[in-house]
Amino acid sequence: MKIIATLDAPAAIGPYVQGKIVNGLLYASGQIPLNPLNGEIVGDSIETQTEQVMKNISAILKEAHSDFDLVIKTTCFLKNIEDFSRFNAIYSKFFDKEFPARSAVGVAGLPKNVLIEIEVIAEVKS
């Protein structure tokens, strides 16, 4: 088991790590739209926040020697399920080949009152 940590993604705001690699798979903790440099929330729209979350995930994938083409599954938590189509428009831009399996769930609230949180499971390049 290997812990993944990068300064290019936000530091954990609780008792968890950015990700762990186990048996060739990366399990990345849920990412919210925080600026990795100062920990501040980026944007107030679902589009801007989704873009930042995906950038944070990209940094974790890179640190783990993976990328969006190797993502197996995502779990997406939306504060406002009405944002679903606008969220999809940004999310889909990050996948070049195939989309991963996915669950998308509307929730009552998220840490720091953000609009989106996404966690991923991805294959790691050997």
Curated annotation (Swiss-Prot):
Alphabetical list of Pfam families matching this protein: Ribonuc_L-PSP
- GO-annotated molecular function: deaminase activity
Disulfide connectivity for this sequence is none
Name the GO cellular-component terms.
cytosol
Described purpose of this protein according to its UniProt entry: Implicated in the regulation of isoleucine biosynthesis.
| Recorded family membership | Belongs to the RutC family.
Q: What is this protein called?
A: Putative regulator AldR
Q: Which organism is it from?
A: Lactococcus lactis subsp. lactis (strain IL1403) (Streptococcus lactis)
Q: What gene is this protein translated from?
A: aldR
